[in-house]
Amino acid sequence: MDINYERPDPYYLLNKIDKEEKNKNRGKLKIFFGYAAGVGKTYAMLRAAHYMKELGKDIVIGYIEPHARMDTMSLTKGLPQIPVKNIDYKGVILREFDVDKALLRKPEIILVDELAHTNAKSQRNKKRWKDIEELLDAGIDVYTTLNVQHIESLNDIVANITHVSVRETIPDKVFDDADKVELIDIEPDELLKRFTDGKIYRKEQVKRAFNNFFTKNNLYALREIALRRTADRVNFEIEIARLSKGQITVMATSDQILACIGTSPSSARIIRTAARMAESYHSKWIALYVDTGRSLGKADKETLNANFNLVELLGGELVTVHGENVADQIIRYAELRNTTKIVIGKNHKRTGTLLHFYAKDVVDKLMDSNSYIDVYMIPNSSYYRDHKNSILSKISIQHKGSVKDVLKAIIIMAITTDIAELFSYMGFKDVNVIMIFILGVIIVYMATKGQIMGIISSIAAVLVFNYRFTEPKNSFIVYDKSYLVTFPIMMIVAFIIGSLTNKVQKEAQDSNMREKRTQTLYIVSGKLLSAVGTSEVVSIGIKYISRLVNRNVICYLADTSNKLSTPFVYKKDKGAKEEIIMSKDENAAAYWTFLNGKESGCGTSTFYRAKGYYIPIKIKNKVLGVIGVSCPSGPLRPQKKAVVDTVTGQIAIALDREILSKEQEKSKVEIERERLRSNLLRSISHDLRSPLAGIKGAASTILENGELIDEKRKQELINGIYEDTEWLIRLIENLLSMTKFDEGNTKIKKDVELVEEVVSEAVQRSSKYFKNHKIKVSVPEDVIMVSMDGSLIEQVIINLLDNASKFSPKGSTIEIKVYEKKKDVVFEIIDEGQGISEDILPNIFDRFFTNGSKISDSRRGVGLGLAICKSIVEAHGGKIEAVNKGSGGAIFKFNIPKEL
């Protein structure tokens, strides 16, 4: 974590700018906030309204909940009121706020009681807070009231305390975004007196409410929650104001504890102390580790990881910063986070050593440079034992030179000696030769890992210089006593410069690593944003997790039955073993994480023997799946855990976006389906009426006047009944076909069919309907065989013929043309009608789409025939289209693949 203390915090600065931009032309929201009904929220709101009226403000009442307290209701007098809506709901008259009248009236300030209220179903918005959003967007200031149990994030907490579940809630963001929150607070004893006097509820409701909600313990708990929630909001506002200006001086509005930890085992004591203090003060706590860039041995790394895990276990926030001056970094970060208390270990000094007589430890420096943050010192009597073990660990493990490093050092020092010999031969003085050796030592530091080779090279450089370049040469004897000073200085200078070089090199490597990690996280964030589909989101996510932590990664997603589906796996290399999915234990760990929404596996206390580390893909308290990372060589380091957590969080957001997208699509489909149902009922009611009326009229004429009607007229009436009945049958067939396609129940039963026979059968079945038109059929002489569902293709041809007959003049010709084109068979139905308007061509195959022009048989049609044709043709893998003929009329053509 890299922090720039010299400039405003971008997060808080953006928050401030965003709020200012958002509120530029927007109304202001003021919430009168309380911990229970009866504390006086509405009373305080009405008092404030009268005060604003005295100042000359245009203020009106939008809605006030009727109260039992007469002194509250009396305050409504003298304030103009917008009439409420009276809505009849199942015989009960409901009074609702009329947002449209309020927007039309557009006062400066409006009073709307009960922010969390749920509107009646006939209202435009489901929730009253959405009505208030409309008022704010229109530039109207709003006063409203709210109880603590109606805030969404506190709903469960309040329910656990009171055993009463409140359904009417508002999002936390509505409360947090309010411009002002005024806490209305009274003592619980006074509230209980109001309650028993019947000033809050009617007498008949008092007993039931007293037994369930209005108990003294409940009211004290609710009061504390309300006070704390208000304090949290004020604290966040202070943070925005403070850090957006780059001001990092501590403003102790609430307690926050900073635990300073390191590689010492005694840091565990500091962590536990900070956690206990945070619990006592009801405050947050942060564990801070300052990475000075020094190399850590294996034991130090293990201890540090154990300390990091303890922080997570005890619920603290873990932060790592980088810097050489530990005390300075602690003070700066404490100021940045508005910390009021620092907990740090204090090392016992050994008075017998000169070093400790002059040296100041971190605690002393903190005390000297800080006068406004409390520092709590935890004695660390085991410091020297820990420090000794740390040094031994670094010498034995961290700085162990490899054979490759030894060879590098020997070669570099050999070359350095040869160059020094050359300089000496050319007459250069000893000081120049010494510089050559120092340069060689620096190169050794740069070329090898750790410091052991550099230290050995420093000693070797002094010995070689003494042996080869001082009198007597080729001997370790020194005649000139000044060299006794030169040699140690030469060795110390070489060591210091080499160490600094090594440190700079390590810092550069760390910086590059952090930069690479940040860049990768930025890339994965962009890719996840642009990913389409669950599979792509997961594939991108686990791929980049694997790259960042250099491990195999697995991802399980929840299926529709709320179980884990077949996993996605990404291996860091093709030959890597998939050990994280090979055993039942691993699956059990992943499933436990899925069910409980908590991490498990290697490095945790649950399924700790597992070979993988499992973390839930979680958003809004819903677990969408599980990410698993293989741990063949031990638990992940905290830095890598943080990376996995970050990318997993991004995956969760992307998956949630996909779920929302699918739900929106599903909602659109449902809305469209409802619209189609409405259109269908409207169309059918019109289209059934005409033929049924005709059938009824003809039948009644025959029944009542059968003997008086001549045979010819009677036959005409019977034919009319028959034709209308056939038309109704075709309509019902089309409706059934479309319903089957919608439900996915239509099965295409393909058989090899003779095209000529299918066309002939369709013409024969429909010829009696088209007596006023000539049907012409043109098929190739060669036999054409196609794999298709013959009965469905017949229905397509009949529907197209029916459509052509409706829009063609009597006596005109309708032609059916069939021909082969590449791998398809093309069917064309050509009429001599008026053609199709260019405006309706794109929609002609849509359901319930009908041409508004008058048709030949005066029947409007439901608008399903062409839609069914499209569904059938596409189910066969073909396409259907309509075009206009140049000489008048239209051509409907569709193709079917010939494959047998």
UniProtKB/Swiss-Prot annotation:
It catalyses: ATP + protein L-histidine = ADP + protein N-phospho-L-histidine. Its main location: membrane. Residues 683-900 form the Histidine kinase domain. It is found in: Cell membrane. The modification Phosphohistidine is found at residue 686. CDD domains: HATPase (cd00075), HisKA (cd00082), USP_KdpD-like (cd01987). One of its GO terms (cellular component) is plasma membrane. Gene3D superfamilies: 1.10.287.130, 3.30.450.40, Backbone structure of the membrane domain of e. Coli histidine kinase receptor kdpd, Histidine kinase-like ATPase, C-terminal domain, HUPs, P-loop containing nucleotide triphosphate hydrolases. The chain crosses the membrane at residues 406-426, 436-456, 482-502, 522-542. Member of the two-component regulatory system KdpD/KdpE involved in the regulation of the kdp operon. KdpD may function as a membrane-associated protein kinase that phosphorylates KdpE in response to environmental signals. This is Sensor protein KdpD. The gene is kdpD.
